[in-house]
Every structure is written in structure tokens, then in C-alpha cells.
Amino acid sequence: MKMRVVSFKAEEDLLVLLDRYAMKYKLNRSEAIRKAIENLVKDEVSEGTVARVEKILLW
């Protein structure tokens, strides 16, 4: 799947924690952010609080 660039602002303390996580798991910052977002969304889908992508695409 093609990836698109997304920009956002984050506090310095959060970036420090993110970089530590990335180094621990040998990820770059982008990979760590993608992993965090994927986990957040998967948790929401499994709890039924967010519609699955397939359902959204059918609208």
C-alpha cells in the first residue's frame, strides 16, 4: 500500500520517549509512530468503538 506523508506537532518529552522506544526495538521514528497508531486503531476496532475500514469503504 502506498504511504503518504503526515505531519504533526508533539511535545519534546513525547519525542524523547518515542525515540527511546524506537531505539529499544530498532525502529526509526516513522516506524515507531506507525506501530503506535496501528495498535491504537486495532484496539478501538476490537472494542467495537471504531468502524472497520471495510464498512467505511462501502459507504
UniProtKB/Swiss-Prot annotation:
Gene Ontology biological-process annotations: regulation of DNA-templated transcription
InterPro entries: Arc_rbn_hlx_hlx, CopG, Ribbon_hlx_hlx
Protein name as catalogued: Uncharacterized protein ORF59b
